[in-house]
């Protein structure tokens, strides 16, 4: 029986994916094997020694201490793409609403309550909110992952010309992307073409201020920008300067701040991107499936600190080893399995940056004594026998 601790409210649809005969799920477990979390801050949390995995029901993991988890052999999962449709729909909605000045027009209309000349004033006042259709306009998409590719495909269906930039596009994302999306190998080449620009990349030290004074200077005059990924991707000071100069005519974002609230041409929503019951269910289901498969079978899917490794069972017992990505590890591991007289049926080894994961199915004396010897290898962090 594995114990799972839930932090925050996790959708019952997701929890139902955890077999009650194998998983004891509780908010009170003191020393869990796994943690399911949404937004709870774990950065200063002391983890119990037997904690094996943390699954975040969402994409961002800035509330989880990744380096410390790696050092302790804790696999951290997220759920990329589970909320993709929710975010993509909102982006498309705000693209249209922002282009037609709907937010400002709707707010102005509220002031007409009990106006005896409402019909006349509506016809007179609507001129100040005239906007543009998006059909035939050009959209630039920075980041073509689960969300960016959906936005690009939807924009194509709406009759837009779409350019995409993503030097790290995955094979799956590329397969799902419309062939009508123009792929740019250089961001600077894409920016001058775009009437609208939307960004869909994770927040990392290397992506902070992706939209800055230099990139904005390359944009077409009057460009409208949408940011439904992370607030830090856009340099606020540079954005405000560009709006003051007329370079940027509109900014729609899910990340309000004092610096941008109340500014003309800026529309802020209260982090609505993934806030749908469907997205919460999808995230919870994916997180539960990831943590279940890892605890039961050692398979790793959508981990942010360990490599992607999954392998069908081949009989015997399964040995799972988290270790540092160093030369000679395989020879040290197989030397011990040979010494123990094991027959290896299947074996896989993959790495991710400075971390690696070796998983093998073997028949023979797979026991605690062997696990102790494997754990004694200097670069080994954790050993599990399943």
Where are these regions (language model features)?
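An N-terminal-biased, well-structured beta-alpha scaffold segment characteristic
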Residues: 1-79, 192, 212-214, 218, ...
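Rossmann-like adenosine-cofactor binding region
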Residues: 43-45, 167-259, 275
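Oxidoreductase and adenylate-handling cofactor-binding alpha/beta cores
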Residues: 88-107, 153-160, 285-299, 334-338, ...
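A conserved regulatory-domain signal marking ACT and ACT-like small-molecule sensing domains
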Residues: 301, 305-386
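Phosphate-binding beta-alpha-beta segment of Rossmann-like dinucleotide-binding domains, i.e.
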Residues: 80-138, 172, 302-304
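N-terminal Rossmann-fold NAD(P) dinucleotide-binding loop
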Residues: 148-149
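Glycine-rich Rossmann-fold phosphate-binding loop(s) that bind the pyrophosphate
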Residues: 144-145
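Rossmann-like dinucleotide-binding domain for NAD(H)/NADP(H)
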Residues: 213, 221-313, 357, 372, ...
